[in-house]
Structure formats: C-alpha cells, structure tokens
Amino acid sequence: MFMFEKPHGMRDTLPGLYETKKKVRRSLTDLIDKWGYQFMETPTLEFYDTVGVQSAIEEQQLFKLLDQDGKTLVLRPDMTGPIARVAASKLLKHGHPLRVGYAANVFRAQEREGGRPAEFEQVGVELIGDGTTSADAEVIALVVGALKNAGLASFKIAIGHAGIADALFVEVLGNVERADVLRRFLYEKNYVGYREHVKSLPLSSIDKSRLLELLELRGGIEVCGRAEEIVDSAQGKSVVDELKALWDILEDYGCTENVRLDLNMVSHMSYYTGILFEVYAENVGFVIGSGGRYNKLLGHFDSPAPATGFGLRIDRLIEALHMKDEPCEIDAVIFSKEQRAQAIAYANEERMKGNKVVLQDLSGIENIDQMTKSFANVTYFIGARKEEQNG
C-alpha cells in the first residue's frame, strides 16, 4: 500500500542496524577527535546559488525545492561545500589552519533502476588553511588510523594527483579541453575505451606510447620514476616531486603498507586541484571513501584558502566490515503493582551501572513469552517474589 512506501532511494534504519552504525561512527569520530579535529554541524538545507552551485555533485543528483520566498534550496549533497561556507564566513578569521570534523547525512538523487541510497551518512574531516604536502599526508594517515580503529584489517588507499594527467594531456594534445574524452574514459575506468581512443588519435607512436603508459602508473614509490619518463613539462615534474614528498611523509606515519599510487586516477569531484585519493576494501567492489585537495573552493566564497579533506561512507564501511546487526544488549524488568517501587529502584540501580534497562508493567503485556525473547536478560518483580531469567 502507498502508505508504507518510501520516496525512491530512501531507507529505514531499524534498531539493530542503528546500533551497528552508531558503533562504527563512534570508532571513527573518537580517533578524529583525538587528532584535534573539532566537530560541527551545518543545516540540512542550503541555498542552491551558494552551496548547490559550488558542489562537485552533478546537477541531476541535487534535490531541489523552493522556500516561501521563491528561492531555490538544495538538500546538502556533501559536507565540503557547507563547511567551506562556514569557514569563509566565520572561522577563517582566526588566521590559522582549521581542523573540522563532521558526521552527517547527505542527499543525492538516484536513478530508479540504480538501487543506490539517496541518503547516506558520511564521517569526515576538512583541513582548511594549510597548503603543504604535510596536510595532505595528515588526512591520508588519519583515514588509515580511523579505518583500523573501526576494525577494518584489509584496505588500500589509491593516491593520485589531479595534475599528472592534465600535464601529460597538455604536452601531447596541446590543451586540457581536447582531452575531455580521455578524461571521461579514465573517470569511468574504461581502460579499453581509453586505449582504443588513443590508437585512433593522429599522433606519433611515441606520444601514443606516453598516453598508454599512463594506464600502467600504479604501484609503490617506483611509479614516480616511471612517471618522470613520460612527462617533460615543469608542471609534470612538480607533480611527481609532490608525490615523492607525500610518500616520504606517509613513511614517517608508518602507513605506506595501506597506500598505493594510481596516477591515472580522475575524479568526478571537479574541484580537486592536487593530491586526491580513494579508499577500497578487500572483496568490496566499490569506493568506501574518498578525498583530496581543493584549493579553489574557498575562493568562491570570497575567502581564498587551500584545503584538503576526506569523507567515509558509513553504510559501505559496514558492508566492508561484514558486520551484522548488533545483538540486543537490553535487559527488561517486568513488574506487578505489588512490587512496582522495588522494580523501579532495581532498574535505576542497573542503569547507574551503565546497563540498558526497560521497565515494563506486567498488565501492559499481551504476550509475555514473545516479548521476553527481545531482551538479553529479564528480571521479574511479581507478587511477593523477584525472579531472574537470563537470555
């Protein structure tokens, strides 16, 4: 019946899954908090002309609506734009790098046949006002630490750079615009299409080989040496030097086992201007998080500042962890009128110990056997006696 249907892409979170999400969220936010990031919240609704326009999310994925004054609003499609707005208007006045954390739901319209959620929770950080490679390394190292703290044992962070493909394309094709088709193939990870398109271009065999070699630039620090062989410009060499410096810092953090370079990475997040990355878990075929440097975004809010950050998807992380819904850890105290005072006192004592306790009047239960199956332990205060039943 229609009354039980939900809008396309919207999902209910039942108690068991809610507890699982809470546990995973806390494991991430606890570590982020220890790294000195301060958490904040922003409105669910933002103006389209500010946050909506500057969002990296594609236009057709924005949820739009009108307010009473006829202004177009959007449900926030990500948290980077809203935090950039707040930083530009209120926080950057402090004059030092900002470290901001968040745990929030974001909204992206989905195709009906896609089966993807249109609302999902992200936990992440933004480091604003620090343009150094140390800042890039910090957020990547924080991702590694947060995922380990959540219990994820096997994962890789693929690190790329927005400038490496652009530098090569400019050298070979003359400008970035002529490379739009190649960039689309890389974004879609359609490497067969990329190869076929390169072969069709009116280029020398040497230049075609350079474009094709881009697909092979994956691995450890040795990838930087191979990248230097296919880029000649100062811009390209500078990107390689930046990646080398990043790797050195990640070695100091002790997290290079969880990272690899992927220099043909292209993100749909068009505002990325430098180092960018995606997080993959073993046996999971989708990205569970991503991030990177976006030095131009704050300028759109009249407060130019370098920035980097990341966002992790709670739902995908739960799937990567192969977590089942959290088992019930709630106890019940069932009482009759004769022992109501004793039952209330007992329940309060247990709650003071940190236990979760439901206090239930016997007269309000239709099927006591069915109800007690929902609790870990049940204590009865009925008539003149007290009885305990362990789940």
Swiss-Prot record:
One of its GO terms (biological process) is L-histidine biosynthetic process. Disulfide bonds: none annotated. The keyword Amino-acid biosynthesis applies. Heteromultimer composed of HisG and HisZ subunits. This is ATP phosphoribosyltransferase regulatory subunit. PANTHER family: HISTIDINE--TRNA LIGASE, MITOCHONDRIAL-RELATED, HISTIDYL-TRNA SYNTHETASE. The keyword Methyltransferase does not apply. It comes from Bacillus subtilis (strain 168). Keywords: Amino-acid biosynthesis, Cytoplasm, Histidine biosynthesis. Its main location: cytoplasm. Belongs to the class-II aminoacyl-tRNA synthetase family. HisZ subfamily. This function is generally fulfilled by the C-terminal part of HisG, which is missing in some bacteria such as this one.
